[in-house]
Swiss-Prot record:
<dbReference type="InterPro" id="IPR027417">
    <property type="entry name" value="P-loop_NTPase"/>
</dbReference>
<dbReference type="InterPro" id="IPR049428">
    <property type="entry name" value="RecA-like_N"/>
</dbReference>
<dbReference type="InterPro" id="IPR049261">
    <property type="entry name" value="RecA-like_C"/>
</dbReference>
<dbReference type="GO" id="GO:0009432">
    <property type="term" value="P:SOS response"/>
</dbReference>
<dbReference type="InterPro" id="IPR020587">
    <property type="entry name" value="RecA_monomer-monomer_interface"/>
</dbReference>
<feature type="compositionally biased region" description="Low complexity">
    <location>
        <begin position="337"/>
        <end position="356"/>
    </location>
</feature>
<feature type="region of interest" description="Disordered">
    <location>
        <begin position="337"/>
        <end position="362"/>
    </location>
</feature>
<dbReference type="InterPro" id="IPR020588">
    <property type="entry name" value="RecA_ATP-bd"/>
</dbReference>
<dbReference type="InterPro" id="IPR023400">
    <property type="entry name" value="RecA_C_sf"/>
</dbReference>
<dbReference type="InterPro" id="IPR013765">
    <property type="entry name" value="DNA_recomb/repair_RecA"/>
</dbReference>
<feature type="binding site">
    <location>
        <begin position="67"/>
        <end position="74"/>
    </location>
    <ligand>
        <name>ATP</name>
    </ligand>
</feature>
<comment type="similarity">
    <text>Belongs to the RecA family.</text>
</comment>
<dbReference type="GO" id="GO:0005829">
    <property type="term" value="C:cytosol"/>
</dbReference>
<protein>
    <recommendedName>
        <fullName>Protein RecA</fullName>
    </recommendedName>
</protein>
<dbReference type="GO" id="GO:0140664">
    <property type="term" value="F:ATP-dependent DNA damage sensor activity"/>
</dbReference>
<comment type="function">
    <text>Can catalyze the hydrolysis of ATP in the presence of single-stranded DNA, the ATP-dependent uptake of single-stranded DNA by duplex DNA, and the ATP-dependent hybridization of homologous single-stranded DNAs. It interacts with LexA causing its activation and leading to its autocatalytic cleavage.</text>
</comment>
<dbReference type="GO" id="GO:0005524">
    <property type="term" value="F:ATP binding"/>
</dbReference>
Length: 362
C-alpha cells in the first residue's frame, strides 16, 4: 500500500489536472476559505427574510413558491424582482399563464422598462428560454409563472380529451437536470410559482400536492407554502390580507419556520408593518398602550399610523431593519470593532445582496 506522502502527492497531481481541464475551483476542500458568503435577494418582508435564516432567497438556487389561488404568490415574486433590480440586477419573468399585470408590478416597485418578459406558447419553449437566459450569465433572477401552465407541445397540438400521462412531469425533470448546473455557475436564482392540486382517495394526511411531478420538490433548495389567513379591514372595507408563509424545505438553514406579514391591496407586502411587529418582538420598537416609539421618538398612535410614519420616513425604517438583522445575526454589525481578538467566535455570515458586478459569464 502506498505511503501517506505518496497518496497526498498523487491527490495533488490529480487536483492540478482537474483545475487545468475544468477550471480553478472545480474541486475544493469543504472547509476552505474560498467560498463566498451566501448571497441573497431580499423577499420584501423582514419576517420572511428572518424565517429563511439567511436574509432572503439564496442566489444560484431553485426556489418553489406554492399555495392556493390569490394567496400572494405572484406578489411575493414581484417584490423579489424589485429588490433584485434595486441592487443593480437584471430580472426576467416568464409568464406562462399570460396574466402579468404591468401596472400592479409597477406599484410594487418593479422597473417594468428593465424587466424582461416572455409569454411562451409551450412548456418546452418556456424552459428553453429560461435555460438560454441563465446561460447568458447576465441574469440575476428568473421567475416562471407557473409550473401548472407549462403545457407540453404534444398536449397543445393534440385533441381535447387526449391522454398525456406524465408528459409534464418528464418535461420538468429533464429541464431541471439541465438548469441546476447553470444556475450555480452564474449565481442566478430561479423561482417557480406553483399551484395546488388534490389527490383523489386520500383519507390520511394532506390530500394536497403540487403540479409538475416530484422533480421540482427534489431540485428546489427552498420551498415556500404561502396561505391567506385573515382579511384586513378598514371599518367594513377589506384593504388587504394577513399572510402566513411556511418554509417547508430549506437547504440553507433550518426549515419549518413560519413568517406572517400583511399584503395590502394595490401596494403589496407591508414592509413597514413587518418592521413594527418584529421591532416590538425584539424590543427595538417600544409599545406603550396604543403608542409606538423608537429611540425615544414617537412613531404614532396605533399600528396603522406608525406604519404610515415609517413609510414617510424610509431612513428610520432602514435603521430599524438593520438593527433587527444585526440582532438576529443575519448581517454583521457595521459598528463592531474591526480588530476583534483572533480567538473570539466568528461573526455570522453576512447576507449579501445581488450586484451586477458579481455576475460571471457562463
Amino acid at each position: 500500500m502506498a505511503s501517506s506522502a505518496d497518496r497526498e502527492k498523487s491527490l495533488e497531481t490529480a487536483l492540478a489536472q482537474i483545475d487545468r481541464q475544468f477550471g480553478k475551483g472545480s474541486v475544493m476542500r469543504l472547509g476552505s476559505d474560498e467560498r463566498a458568503p451566501v448571497a441573497v435577494i431580499p423577499t420584501g418582508s423582514v419576517a420572511l427574510d428572518v424565517a429563511l435564516g439567511i436574509g432572503g432567497l439564496p442566489r444560484g438556487r431553485i426556489v418553489e413558491i406554492y399555495g392556493p389561488e390569490s394567496s400572494g404568490k405572484t406578489t411575493l415574486t414581484l417584490h423579489a424582482i424589485a429588490n433584485a433590480q434595486r441592487a443593480g440586477g437584471i430580472a426576467a419573468f416568464i409568464d406562462a399563464e399570460h396574466a402579468l399585470d404591468p401596472e400592479y408590478a409597477k406599484k410594487l416597485g418593479v422597473d417594468i422598462d428593465a424587466l424582461l418578459v416572455s409569454q411562451p406558447d409551450t412548456g418546452e419553449q418556456a424552459l428553453e428560454i429560461a435555460d438560454m437566459l441563465v446561460r447568458s450569465g447576465s441574469i440575476d433572477l428568473v421567475v416562471i409563472d407557473s409550473v401548472a401552465a407549462l403545457v407540453p407541445r404534444a398536449e397543445i397540438e393534440g385533441e381535447m380529451g387526449d391522454s398525456h400521462v406524465g408528459l409534464q412531469a418528464r418535461l420538468m425533470s429533464q429541464a431541471l437536470r439541465k438548469l441546476t448546473g447553470g444556475l450555480n455557475q452564474t449565481q442566478t436564482t430561479m423561482i417557480f410559482i406553483n399551484q395546488l392540486r388534490e389527490k383523489i382517495g386520500v383519507f390520511f394526511g394532506s390530500p394536497e400536492t403540487t403540479a409538475g411531478g416530484k422533480a421540482l420538490k427534489f431540485y428546489a433548495s427552498v420551498r415556500l407554502d404561502i396561505r391567506r389567513i385573515e382579511t384586513l379591514k378598514d371599518g367594513t372595507d377589506a384593504v388587504g390580507n394577513r399572510t402566513r408563509v411556511k418554509v417547508v424545505k430549506n437547504k440553507m438553514a433550518p426549515p419549518f419556520k413560519q413568517a406572517e406579514f400583511d399584503i395590502l391591496y394595490g401596494t403589496g407586502i407591508s414592509r413597514e408593518g413587518s418592521l413594527i411587529d418584529f421591532g416590538v418582538e425584539h424590543e427595538i420598537v417600544r409599545k406603550s398602550g396604543a403608542w409606538y416609539t423608537y429611540d425615544g421618538d414617537q412613531l404614532g398612535q396605533g399600528k396603522e399610523n406608525s406604519r404610515k410614519h415609517l413609510l414617510n420616513n424610509p431612513e428610520i425604517a432602514a435603521e430599524i431593519e438593520q438593527k433587527i438583522k444585526v440582532k438576529l445575526g443575519l448581517v454583521k454589525d457595521p459598528n463592531a470593532v474591526a480588530d476583534a481578538p483572533a480567538d473570539s467566535a466568528p461573526a455570522p455570515v453576512a447576507a449579501v445582496a445581488p450586484k451586477a458586478s458579481a455576475r460571471k459569464s457562463a
